């Protein structure tokens, strides 16, 4: 009983330790504390076995020991004391207990109580001096913060004396001394030209890390001046990156912090040459990060930092390759990051002196030539990236032959003239984990990957077991077959990208042996045939599978498929046939992207698809699917895009759709019938219903806040345009063309935004999923080969613009695609009548307006001159009258202008864009004159038949149609009244008229039977 009780107490004490403290113990002294603890427990158990004659009872000693265990656990958890620090003495006490002698125990008990209180005394919160200093810092920070953000300034920092400042946000303390050792201040909305008074930091004498990414403009200290940071003698890390607007004026302050080992000035908009001389006193500096600025050479003074091990100059504008001569003198460098600069020319030979270098990133520059032969001296090199440079000609890997530690190699060229030397004499000593060779006109896989094989096109020997984990040879010219034994040769492969090449033939069945592979992209090749059974059953670790744009055939994923972990599946643009079977996808809750578009699938849309609860993108467009749309399919909660267009679907539209964050719904080119539900626009961002057989009127839509593209072209919609359309405040593209709408154009359409003020919103559907995978980790390269699964779905929007019905694409990963700038309204080919509302001229962001092929009358509103961004204006095939407003010549963006086949008259305006329009824009308007027509506005009409032989000037003024109609009606009425008056008097004319009438009546009667 007693044994069980004490063991139970021991377990409870162990579980009382906080996970963070346990992790800290493991990091500093892994295994030591626990080994000692287990040893003491074993010692205690041995003493029990040796005392078999002693009857074990639940004595006061055992109870006190248990209480001590609890106290030890609580104090250790609260104060940051390691578990061994208190448990071991107490376990020692229990293991040495003489269960027969209470006095001896009490003596030891008193001793351990004293020691326990001593441990408790060592557990300290923050000291009062630093607590007051933190409150002063907060007060100062509030004084330089914008008033709107004052509530967000260190809300947990308060003046409550019972509050432990070591528990405040942005603070880290030493658990033993209670002194502040880290202060982190993130991005803040500070007032303009805000300076930090460094003297406020002086009370933090043991601070080791300062992170001030807060939008500051500089430092100030009216007492200590530039030497202010020298008072922080323990300061090792100073991070001033991001959101700061520092310039070189802060460098004298920084130079005083001679204890610094790490300095980051990343992303501070610093320009021009960096004065390394001004930080020459930082002789202990090991890491210097100046990335994401606008710095350029020279680099003189860098050699003062002799202990520097990591240098990051990426994302700047360094250009001269000769500037690297200074870097070559930094022989203690471990990591050098020079990517995304403007270095031009060949790599200098002196880089071979950096024999301690582990990481070298030269990507995204303008380097050319080849690798220097001196690279064979970089014996410590593990990571080399030469992506996105301007290499041309033959590129040799021979300088890398002896680099036994090389794990990561990346190469690509912005030029299409680079060719890889795939065969060479030296035998390469490295075993790469990551290979990226893109856009290199590669026709063969390099020999260092294939080793001792026959060097035909991409063949591998059966005996190779390569340690390669990441292989990217996409966007090359490799043709032929994948080797049959690729799965045996690369069994450890985790990710492979062979997209955009010219591979042919079947997919090798040996790929089923790649049981560890998680990402496979073979899209945009010429593969054919069925998917091998071993492949669909063996690669059970696959999460991302892209086989798009090939010629695979057969049934889509048989029932025995083992792709149970799939998150992204793209098999679009192939030749898969048959129905969409049940398979194992029916129970997959991790699948996020499923694209089966552009195949030959038949049958109904299976109802089990609604069980794919994690689905965000579903595209089954351009197949031969029939039946109705399952309502449950559109109710999936996370669905953001569904494309069922280009099928043979029938039935009615669903009344509403799901999607927590807005859905893009493409149902065009089907055979859907019936009315459009008034609730359909709820939570819908894009609705494409073009070319169906929908009928009825435009409904009184409810909840229209989300919709910004509405396309209903080519249906059988009737009735007038609903004024509810005026509530589409966020609309960008509105297409109601090719229907049977009638009535007037609502003047309230000027309420439509056609270009929202919030430019951050975008049309695209981009679901970017990051799958962490540490292929390589260093100071600057952390999870460098994290594969970002760009699960975006390109959206195709067809809209009439510039006399063409074109496709516009969006939904790239970024929000600057073409759809973000497309604002248009198409009401053409309907039966609309009446005047064109002048209020439409208020749609200043509109780029396309098409009102052609209607029955619109009156004149062209002069307010259209306010359409500053208009590119295409089509008013053809109406009954418009009057002249073309001269103000329209101010439309500098106008490319297409069509007013053909109307009743317009007068002089055609000239100037600016109107000088570019040809005669086709004005056909069918006989009363228009001037260029580009052949009708002169100054033509004279002569009369050779006049009696006096004189000439009368022909009036070429435009016909006033209103006056013409009025005079014609007056003449008609006057004639009728005159005839009526004549009939009222007895005169020869009246009698003659009556005789004619009588004769006509008699003639008609004689003709009747």
Swiss-Prot record:
What Gene3D superfamilies does UniProt report for this protein, alphabetically?
Answer: Ribonuclease Inhibitor
Task: Show which residues sit on the Cytoplasmic side of the membrane.
Answer: 983-1009
Q: Where is the signal peptide?
A: 1-22
The UniProt entry annotates LRR repeats at 204-231, 232-255, 257-281, 282-305, 306-329, 331-354, 355-377, 379-402, 404-427, 442-465, 466-490, 492-514, 515-538, 540-565, 567-587, 588-612, 613-636, 638-660, 662-681, 682-705, 707-728, 729-752, 819-842, 843-866, 867-891, 893-916
Give the Acidic residues compositional bias ranges: 945-955
Family (UniProt):
Belongs to the RLP family.
Q: What is this protein called?
A: Putative receptor-like protein 8
- Please name the taxonomic classification of the source: Eukaryota, Viridiplantae, Streptophyta, Embryophyta, Tracheophyta
